[in-house]
Amino acid sequence: MTQPAFFKRPLPSTLAEIAASTGAQLVDASRGGIRIIGLASLDQAGPMHLAFFDNHKYAGQLAATKAGACLVSPRFEADVPAHVAVLRSKAPFRAFVSIARDFHGDALRPQSWFDNTAVAASAVIHPSAYLEDEVVIDPLAVIGPDVQIGRGSVIGSGAVIGPGVRIGRDCNVGAGTTIQATLIGNNVLIHPGCHIGQDGYGFIFFGSEGHVKVPQTGRVLIQNDVEIGAGTTIDRGSLRDTVIGEGTKIDNQVQIGHNVTIGRRCLLAAQIGLAGSLTIGDNVALGAKVGINNHLHIGDGAQVTAMSGVKDDIPANGRWGGYFAKPTRQWFRELLAVERLVRDGAPDAGSPKAAPKDRVIE
């Protein structure tokens, strides 16, 4: 349920308007004048809220809901209580998201925490920095020499933008973020606490001198429409650039090593670790806590299951998982084989199939 203390309350809409906006069918047209003032889950919704249902696991919540209306697929339509107006949709969650975006556009992109519309008095702006019109700088942010920031961008409180950084238009840099040696496109959303463009992890062993640092003289290039979750770190390249492709969405606490290239429209879930000089194609999806070794290539459209460890190249459209990762069908077959061994015991030598026997494990 939307909390008005943090998000603006939307203007009321009628069910007829919602049906027209989403393409859903209002089953009982006589209910078209019912007003909806907000969105909520089935278990929290009230008579003036819209909910959705597309998973049988929540059938109990649907039966008990007090929602005024519910977006539902045709196969679940008969399960909706009589007091709830039915909006029939082939994709109820997609329709719900569409309405949520209309109702709560302010939640899609963080704005100034202080309702600033310009540069705060306590922000530090180097004289050589260039800010286009309508740039907002929150208190205590620091903008370094020769920085350029495009129109409509918002820099959060305590953020530090290093020398020469370029930030495009309609971007948002969250509070406490640091950015150096980086070029950023338009419509990029960087959540609080990110660190972008710092040294990559590069050392070489020089005998008695120990591990000697390798200069990291590349950049980070972040293309248009990228979103980067809170606490994520992206190292700049050593000789070539670290690149984040257009439309890629990165979750919280992801580590991206130097020289990594990530393609367009990729999805990276939380706590992924990408070693250096890795190349990831377009439309790749990586589950949470995936680790990928350096100098590998992940093909277009590949998917990797959460908590997998990848040490080999993955072909385009590959579905891999496990530790170490392999094609998912092979991984599942091996898991089943291990389960059978644990359950039945290994066959005796020379016997095609030994009878199960009791074992004592100490």
UniProtKB/Swiss-Prot annotation:
Gene3D superfamilies: Hexapeptide repeat proteins, MurE/MurF, N-terminal domain. The keyword Ligase does not apply. Its EC number is 2.3.1.191. It catalyses: a UDP-3-O-[(3R)-3-hydroxyacyl]-alpha-D-glucosamine + a (3R)-hydroxyacyl-[ACP] = a UDP-2-N,3-O-bis[(3R)-3-hydroxyacyl]-alpha-D-glucosamine + holo-[ACP] + H(+). GO terms for biological process: lipid A biosynthetic process. The active site is at 258 (proton acceptor). Pathway: Bacterial outer membrane biogenesis; LPS lipid A biosynthesis. It is an enzyme of class 2 (transferase). Signal peptide: none annotated. GO terms for cellular component: membrane. The keyword Ligase does not apply. One of its GO terms (molecular function) is N-acyltransferase activity. SUPFAM superfamilies: Trimeric LpxA-like enzymes. Belongs to the transferase hexapeptide repeat family. LpxD subfamily. Catalyzes the N-acylation of UDP-3-O-acylglucosamine using 3-hydroxyacyl-ACP as the acyl donor. Is involved in the biosynthesis of lipid A, a phosphorylated glycolipid that anchors the lipopolysaccharide to the outer membrane of the cell. Homotrimer. NCBIfam families: lipid_A_lpxD (TIGR01853), PRK00892.1 (NF002060). This is UDP-3-O-acylglucosamine N-acyltransferase 1. The lineage of its organism: Bacteria, Pseudomonadati, Pseudomonadota, Alphaproteobacteria, Hyphomicrobiales. The gene is lpxD1.
